Amino acid sequence: MPPPDPLPGTAYGFLSTYKPVLPPRTPWGPVEAGHSSRADAGGQLSNPPRPSTPRVLGIAIPSPLRRLFDYRPCRETPPGGWQPGLRVRVPFGRRQLVGVVIECRDDSELPLTDLKPVDTCLDGTPLPADWLWLCRFTARYYQHPLGDTLHQAMPVLLRQGRPLEARTRERWQPTPAGLETDPPGLARAPRQAELLEMLRQHPHGLGTQAILAQSFTREQLRALADKGLAGAREEPLTAPWKAGEPLLAEPALPLNSEQATALAALHERLDDYHPCLLEGVTGSGKTEVYLQLIEAVVGRGRQALVLVPEIGLTPQTLARFRQRFRVPVVALHSGLTDNERLDAWEAAASGRAPIVIGTRSALFTPLARPGAIIVDEEHDGSFKQQDGLRYHARDLAVARAHHHGIPLLLGSATPSLESLARARSGDWRHLSLTRRASRHAPARLELVDLRGRRRQGGLIPPVIETIRETLTAGHQVLVFINRRGFAPTLACHACGWLAECDHCDARMTLHRQPPLLACHHCDRRRALPDVCPGCGSGDLRPLGSGTERTEETLAALFPEVPVHRIDRDSTRRRDAFERVLTEVRRGEPCLLVGTQMLAKGHHLPHVTLVVVVNADAGLYASDFRALEQSAQLLVQVAGRAGRADHPGRVLVQTLHGDDPHLRRLSEQGYAALADQLLEERRAAGLPPFRFLALLRLESPREEAVNALGGQAAEALRRWIGERSLAVDCLGPVPAPMERRQNRYHLQLMLASSRRSMLHEAGAGLVAWLEATPEARRVRWSLDIDPQTLS
């Protein structure tokens, strides 16, 4: 098989200048009266020198239509003139929508008199040019409508038309008169005197909310102001860090030789695109390398963007960074209010926040002076959006770092096979940390045979005894089971009936808190039956174990020890996860029962035993990535053990202890298994040695989805043949779960060792679907570089 064709200097095979070949213009159908439309190439559109007052604005609007819409400018011209990146409010059918100007020109496909005018220009200055470039690149690469891409990439309040400007707060300080030893007018106002004394102790001032939190009132503040003893000044919520001020709040930690070597390699090229993979065992001090790289970047007056996989990691990362740095550090994630998110976005765009930390969507945060991008746990599947705009934040971080010409650092104890292939080929620099910061080596996976063994809550007696010994020694235990609920399903032992979802090809999960049956695919809920719906028997029993059942079993076995369950159900309330982790970090003996939420980067220094209830789920799955992902999860959860003063131990229960992949992982480690998986992928012609795109079709009508799938495959194969493209078209075939949410799902796979050809075929397929009337009655999406086949 020929090797893939990444362009020179790229990471995953795409350059910031990469432009897929688009198919010929297609009949787009009738144009809505009042504005013209042009095919949206998502960044491929040229923007000729604009006239001082353009007659036509090409505007991207949040819609599924892959085109720009032409409008006439409104009468009021923005202060800087009309230019790409300005947000505008426009009439669209019977609605008013917020769009973004992409083109300024003099011509349109419709007579200018037929074009609707823009209602309002919402910005005095355009949104950042680099942000607009990133959105256009994203739309082009992922074959997604530019208008919707822009919509998804900006905070909710900007989508609604809110101005992009810094919110301010009052900061109170004593006046020169208030600094006198015995200021007048306070003899009969003791609370005002106390307030003034508190302000004197804070020469840089105090915010209003901080003052009110100390039981003072706004009336007392106004009284001091009226007496000329205190005054307030307005400042941005995120105050800028001034060059020359101390950068660090606490000194950096000393580095071991491996950390120092990695940091020196990163310092070599701080002014250039420099992709590096930092492969470090769990607990090896990758975060300290991040911190010292950021210190160098911010010290040069630039900004750093740090991406973490899940919201659960953001509080601890944020706390660690704020503890180290005196500069503003802002966070962006889904747990923020709309105002908080806009404040952080604006602080980053203005440059007042030198450090930005966030989850997947934070990749779209504009930076005034970009200096470095860091992706922690780069292998994590959470970086891939699984609906709508199906982008991968890690891959876009590569493109963004290349565009800015800045260092990119991807860190992981279990790197993705895509990243490993790039590092081992020499496209990226490969940095390694093989030693833990503690004196103990990472714990080896000990396989425990489940065959023929009696279980309680999924645990066999020898494992329960090891848990008891660990707790008696005063340590903590993490029990990992990647299935929430009480049991995977409910079954009748008289007739074999199973609780199945009416809307999905899946079994319903039994929950005890509250008691119900729930489908984890469509969220359908059902009350627990008193008797079997099939035969009327009352012999209904749970099958298997979930987090709730294991929690219940452990609470009964160890009543004197707290049991903390951490899964999506138990952490729905804001800060619930962080409160549990705070309690666990106190060090008292306890049991943690959780899903993969616990496996991702959390520092649990008092955990010395990790138990994996069942390691078999990914061994024989239909998805070719399942083995890689299962191995990553096992190694990550194992890495929670023995991170401090005591060595760790990891027990992995399995029914397949003789599986060659599992044995290689336990005996030789992740790197050895990754080598084997890469060879298997190469032989099979799978990523990272080939590129994929997946067309997903779904409809409540099975015949509709099957008919369109067949037509699409036939049209695509004909189109590929006419252009002699080296692209394979596989399918259509039913999805692994054919019926989900009462809709039938069908898939068509495109595969090629030439990314440019894959994109050309994908663009042709999208054009055919948009021009085909039957496709309007079926929901469809094209997933570039799919991470799951479900």
What positions do the PLM features span?
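A general secondary-structure junction signal
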Residues: 103-105, 154, 234-236, 481-483, ...
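Inter-lobe coupling/hinge segments of SF2-like helicase ATPases
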Residues: 250-256, 260-263, 272-706, 718, ...
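Short beta-strand elements
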Residues: 564, 720-735, 776-784
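Short conserved micro-motifs at the rims of enzyme active sites and ligand-binding pockets
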Residues: 707, 741, 760-761
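Long hydrophobic segments that form regular secondary structure
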Residues: 710-712
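Nucleotide-binding motor/catalytic cores of P-loop/tubulin-like NTPases across gene-expression machines
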Residues: 723, 740-744
